[in-house]
C-alpha cells in the first residue's frame, strides 16, 4: 500500500489476505484518478447535472427565532435520491468504471445508500446487488422497492442482528469471491483502507460548499457545525472543511433507548477500541470482545462501529460526540417539520435534537450553527406515524 491508512492509531487494514490485492488496486486507482482532470471533470458534471450539486445553505429563520441561535441547514436532503449518499456513490461507481469493473455490490441500512448505489449503477450501466438486513428490509420497504425499480437486486440478510453490520459481512464475503469484476461500494467512512479516506474525499464536497456559502452570507465562519454520526460519512464530509479552524464540531449518535439501557448505537459515547469490518476504531462489544447489537430508531445509525477518523477526532478532542435518544430524535423531527416545513430523515433528526440541546445552554445564545441535513424524511413517514400513534 502507498498510504498507511491511519488516523492516529485508528484505521488500517484488517482483512483476509485474499482481499489485499483488491485493496491495493483500489488505492492505486483512487490516488491516480483523484488528480486526473478527465475523471474529475466527469465527476463534477454528474454531481451537478444528475445529483443536484451544489445544495443550498438555508437560513432557518423560524427555527432560529425559536431556539435563539442563527441556524443554517446544509440541504443535502435536496439531492437526487434524497440524501448525501449520492456524492459518494457517483464517485465510487465512476472510479469502478474507470477500473474496468462491471458489477457493484453494496450494503445498506436505512436504504439511502442502496438507492444511491442503484441509481449510480443505472447511470453508468453496471449490475448492482445490494445486501440489506431483513430487519431493515421490513423497516424500509419503500426504499427496497425504489432500489429494485432502479435495476438493483436486493439480497436480504437473515443472520446475526439482521441489520447493517450483517449486511456488510455478507457483502465482504461476496467481494472476496468476485474481486475481478466487482467493486464493493462501501457507503460510509468505515472499512479497511482506502475506504475511509476515499469516502471522505467524495463527501468533502459538502464541507467545501458549506464553508464557501457561510462566508458569503455571514462574512465569517460558524461557531459550531453539527451532524449525525452512524458510520460517519456525512459528518466527516462537512467537518473536513472546518477542522483547521476555531469551529466546534459535534456529532450526534444514535442513543436508542438510552446509554444505561444498553440498547443504543452510541459507539463513541459508550464503546471501546476494537476491530470491525477491516479497521481499528471504536466498537460496541461485550467483555469477551464479541460485537454487540446496536439499536436506533434510525436504521442508518444502528451500526456498532464508527469511522476511524471520528475515533481519532474524539480522542484528540477536536470533535465531541453526544448520544441522542429515539425520543429526542422524534422530537427533533417534529420540531423542524413544525417550524420550517422540512421533514428530516430520522438520522438527520438526531442532529436537530442535538441542536435543540445545544441551544438550551445560555452560553450558546446568538451563536451561528450549521446543521448538516443529511437526508429527507420521506422514507421514515410510516415509521414516524406509527411512533406517534397515527394511522396512515
Swiss-Prot record:
InterPro entries: Trp_synth_b_CS, Trp_synth_beta, Trp_synth_beta/beta-like, TrpB-like_PALP, TrpB-like_PALP_sf. Its cofactor is pyridoxal 5'-phosphate. Pfam families: PALP (PF00291). It catalyses: (1S,2R)-1-C-(indol-3-yl)glycerol 3-phosphate + L-serine = D-glyceraldehyde 3-phosphate + L-tryptophan + H2O. Belongs to the TrpB family. PANTHER family: TRYPTOPHAN SYNTHASE (PTHR48077:SF3), TRYPTOPHAN SYNTHASE-RELATED (PTHR48077). Tetramer of two alpha and two beta chains. NCBIfam families: trpB (TIGR00263). Pathway: Amino-acid biosynthesis; L-tryptophan biosynthesis; L-tryptophan from chorismate: step 5/5. GO terms for cellular component: cytoplasm. The keyword Plastid does not apply. The modification N6-(pyridoxal phosphate)lysine is found at residue 85. The keyword Lyase applies. Keywords: Amino-acid biosynthesis, Aromatic amino acid biosynthesis, Lyase, Pyridoxal phosphate, Tryptophan biosynthesis. It is an enzyme of class 4 (lyase). One of its GO terms (molecular function) is tryptophan synthase activity. The beta subunit is responsible for the synthesis of L-tryptophan from indole and L-serine. The gene is trpB1. Its EC number is 4.2.1.20. It comes from the Archaea. This is Tryptophan synthase beta chain 1.
